[in-house]
UniProtKB/Swiss-Prot annotation:
Protein name per the record: Vacuolar segregation protein pep7
Zinc finger (FYVE-type) residue numbers: 136-201, 275-332
Keywords, comma-separated and alphabetical: Metal-binding, Repeat, Zinc, Zinc-finger
Annotated region described as Disordered, given as residue ranges: 1-31
Length: 536
């Protein structure tokens, strides 16, 4: 190797020096022929003039590492380019595929259509009379979108409102009936805009589905509550008899302890259980022993141990009254609860009732609004639907009356100090504010709704027109009443002046002219009241 390059030539064996001169000349001739043949490249077969050219050819052509690295990098870059181009094409195809699909349920058809094709299958079922006509250079109906409706952006009719939207603003789906109304049970999946999607019934409900378990709870609770109530009444009667017994009978402490007179009197009211029958305490389930002696409850007569008995001191009783834990739970704790409740301020209970009525008003107001919106949705009005709306409105107004009555009870309740009066006044003011806001927000039922007909926008415009006429007529009547009241005021002043001047003949004339004015005012007031009811 020379200058860092590998030299290729014919290797001459070392044993040539041992040969004779004849053999040396012969081998030299053969070696010269081998050297000539060695100028051919062993890799690519290229013939070169000499060994130096062969070495240069090998170094430049076949052993250049930098060129191999560049070729390898070029091949890697070309592979990455081909892969990225293929992925981009695949992404574009997937996007086009997804763009033509709807991310919602289909109608269960067996045609195999998906996306817009499946949505178009319902076009023959749902009415299209309300669709917006197509004109050139239309833009999306969404107020925040200014896309031009074309083949790329799309031009999709909302099946509910009929307006035209782009693909992005019509990617919603709801169930509609054949009349393009909301029908979540028997409707068909149709493509709609966002406003119609969010405007469907129940979308803005925050409570969700409610299943009341009160009836089941009441079924299980009522027997237990009735049993406890009957037990409380029975124990209260026995307690009352015991108190009357000790107040009517003159029993001294000596008679009670030595002559067992108290025991006989108590047994005359409550039958005591036989000691020999009971071997285990019913309260703690322990056997009776010398240290765990038997005792009798004075209210129920059961046999209990001395560790499960409670001693209740009574004013008229010469010795403590022995009762069991069950009687203490059923009677004395109820008495204590009722006593503590009776000590609380009276208007506090009214405030609690106010909260209950308020919650009920919120629930019935929501139910009334839902039923009224369903009634005015454009569907055929049935007698049952109209009755439900009227009943809910009536129930809501009854709750408002109860709410107002409870509020007046709080206001009229006597106060012991200024702080209590200020607290009551704040509660009443808040209740008044809430009641006024609720009544003002209450939507009235249109008076000319008829069973068997549908509520339309024309009916609404007609109602507004009639309402304006009623308001105009009412304003005219009020102006007339004001004029008549001014005349009455002037006539009354004239009567007072005539009385002061003792002109009694003029007084009679003025009084006779005053009566028709009052009758006319009363008649106009009734007409205004009738118009108010008509407006409601």
């Amino acid at each position: 190797m020379q200058n860092g390059k590998r030299r290729i030539g014919v290797r001459i064996s070392s044993n040539l020096s041992n040969h004779s001169g004849t053999n040396l000349s012969t081998s030299a001739q053969s070696d010269s022929s081998n050297i000539v043949k060695a100028t051919e490249c062993p890799i690519c077969g290229l013939e070169l003039p000499n060994l130096s050219a062969l070495n240069d050819h090998l170094d430049v052509t076949h052993f250049n590492d930098n060129e191999k690295i560049h070729k390898r990098q070029d091949s890697i870059n070309s592979w990455l380019t081909r892969t990225l181009n293929g992925a981009s094409a695949l992404q574009m195809k997937a996007a086009q595929r997804l763009w033509r699909m709807e991310p919602y349920e289909q109608n269960g058809d067996s045609s195999g259509a998906v996306g817009l094709e499946a949505t178009k299958l319902t076009d023959s079922l749902v009415v299209k009379n309300h669709w917006q006509p197509e004109v050139p250079d239309m833009v999306c109906h969404d107020p925040m979108c200014d896309k031009l409706l074309n083949f790329i952006n799309g031009h999709i009719h909302c099946r509910k409102c009929g307006y035209i939207f782009c693909n992005f603003h019509s990617m919603y789906q709801i169930k509609l009936s054949i009349h393009a109304t909301y029908d979540s049970e028997n409707g068909f999946w149709c493509r709609v805009c966002r406003e119609c999607y969010e405007g469907r019934p129940g979308y803005n409900d925050s409570n969700g589905l409610i299943r009341s378990r009160f009836q089941t709870f009441e079924t299980f609770r009522k027997p237990l509550a009735d049993k406890r109530r009957i037990e409380f009444l029975r124990l209260s009667k026995r307690m009352k008899k015991l108190e009357e017994l000790w107040t009517s009978e003159n029993v001294s402490m000596l008679d009670a302890l030595l002559l067992n007179k108290a025991k006989r009197l108590e047994q005359s009211i409550v039958h005591w259980q036989d000691d020999s029958v009971v071997q285990i305490c019913p309260e703690c389930n322990n056997s009776f022993t010398l240290t765990r002696r038997r005792r009798h409850c004075r209210l129920c007569g059961r046999v209990i141990c001395r560790f499960c008995v409670l001693e209740i001191s009574l004013p008229q009783h010469p010795q403590p009254l022995l009762i069991c834990m069950s009687c203490n739970q059923n009677y004395f704790r109820n008495v204590l609860y009722q006593t503590e409740r009776s000590k609380s301020l009276g208007y506090i209970r009214h405030i609690e009732h106010l909260q209950v009525f308020r919650q009920a008003m919120v629930n019935y107001y929501r139910l009334y609004e839902d039923s009224l919106s369903e009634l005015l949705s454009g569907e055929i009005i049935t007698e049952a639907t109209l009755k439900i709306v009227k009943d809910r409105r009536k129930k809501f107004l009854e709750l408002c009356v109860k709410y107002d009555g409870t509020m007046k009870k709080i206001a009229n309740h006597p106060s012991s100090n200024d702080a209590e009066e200020q607290f009551k006044q704040n509660v009443v003011n808040e209740a008044k504010r809430y009641l006024q806001e609720t009544i003002l927000r209450l939507q009235a039922i249109p008076y000319h709704l008829q069973v068997g007909q549908a509520w339309t926008s024309e009916s609404e415009r007609e109602l507004e027109k009639k309402k304006e006429q009623v308001e105009k007529k009412q304003e005219e009547l009020m102006q007339t009443r004001i004029v008549l009241e001014e005349q009455v005021f002037l006539v009354e002043n004239m009567i007072e002046d005539a009385k002061a001047k003792r002109k009694f003949s003029e007084v009679e004339t003025l009084l006779s002219s005053l009566a028709p004015l009052h009758e006319e005012i009363h008649s106009i007031t009734e007409k205004i009241h009738d118009l108010d009811l008509f407006d409601i």
